[in-house]
Structures are given as structure tokens and as C-alpha cells.
């Protein structure tokens, strides 16, 4: 219920931004200026790219969704899948914009019905993500959405989940790409699209 309420608020917020803020998707928008960098968080040496400041800017958020939709509309997507948790934010707004079903990819133990799961590596140990078994149909062309591409481990696991259910990964999209972490190499067989790169700055 909490997730449903959150997604409703996100979509309503997007509706408001769409109505009140004209945003030409062809216009170049400097997203870097809307993303805060927090040094040494969550541990020393890490430059954390904080998208909460982007989300507080309705024009920037609207621009992101327009760019994603413009890129993927010609690709005959049938479903949008958002990765917990920030992928839900962009995935919900994009699903609304493209008039497509939204599928949630969640951490282990968060989905109530029958699921399939996929393990992926962490810095120390492993974790799992899950998807409802009935969320993807054979042949579905699925666009997977997350906020940021780092090492690519979570997105790779999400792609595996879609493929376990005989879906087709039609694309993987992100707001932020961190090229120095080489996530694109792990996902090179897929169509990748991101809006802004942070290369160690």
C-alpha cells in the first residue's frame, strides 16, 4: 500500500509539472546542475550523485521523462519495469507518459505473489531481486528503468529476470551514468540510454 501511494503521488506530481511547465524535449537541459554531489558519502572516497535535488525541480524531472519517451517510443515497448527504489520514480512517470503497464522489480521478500528471483554480487557478499511471475508475458518488449548506472550488477540481474520469464529486454535506461565504473561493459548486449555522465568530477 505504501508503494502504491508513493507511485500515485509521483504520477500526480508529474501530471502537474506537465500541465504547468512547457518543456521542449529537443531543448538541451543541463541536468548536471540539478544533481547534487555529496563527497565522502556513504563512505570516504565516494562522490555520491544525489538525484533528490533533480526531483525537487519539476522542469528537470519533466525533461528526463520526455527524453526517455522520445528515445523509446519508436521501439515498440510493451512494458516498463522499474528497479527498487529510485527506478520506481522515473519508471512510473515514464509508464504514464507512454501509456504502458508498470512492473516493479523489488528486493527479496517485498512482493506478495509468486515470484522469480535473481542473485547479484555486492561489494561484500550477494543480494537478490525479484519480480512477480505473472508480470511479464512471453515476447513482451520490456524497458528497464533505474536512476543510475554504476557497476551494472543490479541492472544485469533485472535483465536476467525479464529473460527468465521469456520477455525481451528492449532497453535499459538511466538518468546518470558513472563511466569509470564500467557498467556499460557488463550490459553491452543491451540498448543503453542515459542522460548525463559523471566521470570522476
Regions found by a protein language model. Name each.
Residues 3-8, 65-69:
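Short, amphipathic alpha-helical "lid/cap" segments that border enzyme active or binding sites
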Residues 77-84:
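Short glycine-rich phosphate-binding loop at a beta-alpha junction
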Residues 98-99, 119-123, 187-191:
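Short, hinge-like loop/turn segments at secondary-structure boundaries
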Residues 7-34, 156-201:
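PRPP-dependent phosphoribosyltransferase catalytic core
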Residues 89-98, 159:
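Short Gly/Thr/Asp-enriched flexible loops that form oxyanion-binding sites at enzyme active sites
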Residues 20-77:
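Active-site-facing substrate-recognition patch
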